[in-house]
Amino acid sequence: LPKHLSNVRIGDIVLLTSPYAGEDQPVVIEETARWLAEEMRIKMFGPGVPGISWETNMNAPEPDNSPTHRAMTGNNIPIVYPLVNIESLTSDRVFFMSLPLNVERMEGSWVRAIAIEDVL
């Protein structure tokens, strides 16, 4: 378990950011995604983009080509991305909400993402 995930509590919304981009950015692998989804039962996953990537296998057919993504969505955990400006947050714990557009027959939507510090 990466040290920066030791603060995750059961039922949290997990937002991740990193100052790195490209090949240097950290990758959320399937094992970590399954731990977050199945052991910690997180409510939502929000990777900062650029900065966080997830494991992909472009040679595999769908749905096996993105095991990290599938670990989340297969456990009914929404993924909110790309989150921008989360690197400006200064607290480890924030109140977070994601307000999607109400669009019929869509499985995804843009959101208004709001993080409030110093509430928890």
Locate each region found by the language model.
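Active-/binding-site microenvironments in catalytic and ligand-binding cores
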Residues: 1-120
